[in-house]
Amino acid sequence: MENRQKKKLLVLVREAIYRKHYSKRTEEAYIHWIKRYIFFHNKRHPLEMGNAEIEGFLTHLAIKKRVSASTQNQAFSALLFLYREVLNKPLEGPINSLRAKRPKRLPTVLTKEETFKIIQCMSGVHGLMAKLLYGSGLRLSECVEMRVKDIDFAQRQIIIRDAKGMQDRVTILPEGLVKPLQEHLERVKRLHQKDLKKGGGSVYLPFALGRKYPGAGRGWVWQYVFPSARLARGPRDGVLRRWYMSETTLQRAVHKAARLSGINKRVSCRTFRHSFATHLLQNGYDIRTVQELLGHKDVKTTMIYTHILNRGGLAVRSPIDML
């Protein structure tokens, strides 16, 4: 316990997150909210605080900052983790904060023609990634973090590892992307071979694999499908290595393509995933199949796309057209 007290709180948080095998994304989110919580209460140590202070912070987020329900839930999860896993001080009783309202918004969906227009305005690696977002229904993070071993060309499928909810799932590999993807991987392989010759070529391995198999990170199958152009030091181990392409890079490319195409909708990388689901339903695929491809735990989440199909000009005939 003395050693734990000597360490800074955020170091202990990172170590606990690492032991739980949480993603780097979750780590940064939890650190962010724990910092916000401490600063909100004038830098008091969390051990000096409890339910009342958590309620005050979460209510502040809902009322003053007007965060979404999902953002407030993430902040709450971070604090629960802090008290339970780091401080060994589980919270007693309910947290009676004012909860943020979950807005009822329909996702932005492109028509098939609009999707084609935007993709036509993209080329190279970004164009290939956009086609995967739409053609396979990938989340942005799933696309950029994909590894060579996750693509099964023989079965025409992509295995999404540790997706949302820490579950694997399988989605389709479009026939039309097989050759472009194979050609792209040949270029990536040449880059990897150059890195190996320079004494590098190692990528970050998930969970404890790096310790169990020290040399595995240099293997071809573990390399990222869409590697970054530059080497960078790992935030956890400080090792200089090639990471995956930044999400921001692809986001900017999609936004630019949407502007060039003249589509007057708020288009993001997520829009391709929404369009993938909607177009499958339009083509007659059943809701359960779409649910599995998207990786939704609850079919109610997938049902939002049926609401899109049942609303708007294609589903209802305006009375003015009957005059």
Predicted segments with their positions:
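Conserved catalytic core of the tyrosine transesterase superfamily
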Residues: 1-323
